């Protein structure tokens, strides 16, 4: 039997969400250019979602898309619409409406599943620029250096015992209890359960030092590892 020409499967991706607090082009345009300039290796040509929860009034979506495209960002959808007018404007611009997972539908109770031990992925070689390492359903341990432009992703914790220059995204499946441990933090980006800092947001006195990152009340916190 020949294979079907297409196959539809469920999957999940880690995406950056741009929260708009203003919809004026003259305000948004320079802010986008400045933000992409802070981490061009991570943000240039990156897919993003626009959240408009804090936007009052209408958005000129065609102009907004041109600005994002000019800054090197690809808008794949919009979240945070508060009324039908906003939703229709987004759809009219040809953009999908996305949900960020709040207010999930309740499911019927089921018998508890037998716990499965989380797997830990251990990488003992350098992680080069352009490489992506993903530890699904577990922790990720890297005993060597991580180059700029490399990406570490784990559903659990991330441990880096070399110099961390790339991107570290812990709690990728949404676990806010995940943590990041670095013996030398020089990262382009650190993220736990979707909350992230770019390099310029990492407190200066911890940059280049041994550091431990966690989430507290929904915000990233950092302290010395030793």
Swiss-Prot record:
Keyword Ion transport (UniProt): no
Top-level division of the source organism's lineage: Bacteria
Subunit text: Interacts with MinD and FtsZ.
The protein's role, per its UniProt record: Cell division inhibitor that blocks the formation of polar Z ring septums. Rapidly oscillates between the poles of the cell to destabilize FtsZ filaments that have formed before they mature into polar Z rings. Prevents FtsZ polymerization.
Similarity-based family: Belongs to the MinC family.
Lineage: Bacteria, Pseudomonadati, Pseudomonadota, Gammaproteobacteria, Enterobacterales
NCBIfam families: minC
GO biological process: cell morphogenesis; division septum assembly; regulation of cell division; regulation of cell septum assembly
InterPro entries: CAP/MinC_C, MinC, MinC_C_sf, MinC_N, Septum_form_inhib_MinC_C
UniProt protein name: Probable septum site-determining protein MinC
Record flagged with keyword Cell division: yes
Keywords: Cell cycle, Cell division, Septation
Organism field: Edwardsiella ictaluri (strain 93-146)
Gene behind this protein: minC
């Amino acid at each position: 039997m020949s294979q079907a020409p297409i196959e539809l499967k469920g999957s999940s991706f880690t995406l950056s969400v741009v929260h708009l607090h203003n919809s004026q082009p003259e305000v948004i345009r320079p802010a986008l250019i400045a933000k992409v300039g802070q981490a061009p290796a991570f943000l240039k040509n990156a897919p993003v979602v626009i959240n408009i929860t804090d936007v009052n009034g209408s958005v000129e979506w065609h102009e907004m898309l041109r600005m994002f495209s000019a800054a090197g960002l690809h808008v794949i959808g919009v979240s945070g619409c508060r009324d039908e007018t906003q939703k229709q404007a987004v759809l009219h611009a040809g953009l999908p409406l996305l949900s960020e997972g709040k207010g999930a539908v309740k499911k019927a109770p089921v018998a508890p599943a037998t716990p499965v031990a989380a797997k830990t992925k251990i990488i003992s070689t350098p992680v080069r620029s352009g490489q992506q390492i993903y530890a699904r359903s577990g922790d990720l341990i890297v005993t060597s250096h991580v180059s700029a432009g490399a990406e570490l992703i784990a559903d659990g914790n991330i441990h880096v015992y070399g110099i961390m220059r790339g991107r570290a995204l812990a709690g990728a499946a949404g676990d806010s209890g995940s943590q990041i441990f670095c013996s030398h933090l020089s990262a382009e980006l650190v993220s736990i359960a979707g909350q992230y800092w770019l390099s310029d947001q990492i407190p200066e006195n911890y940059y280049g030092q041994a550091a431990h990152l966690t989430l507290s009340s929904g915000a990233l916190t950092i302290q010395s590892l030793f």
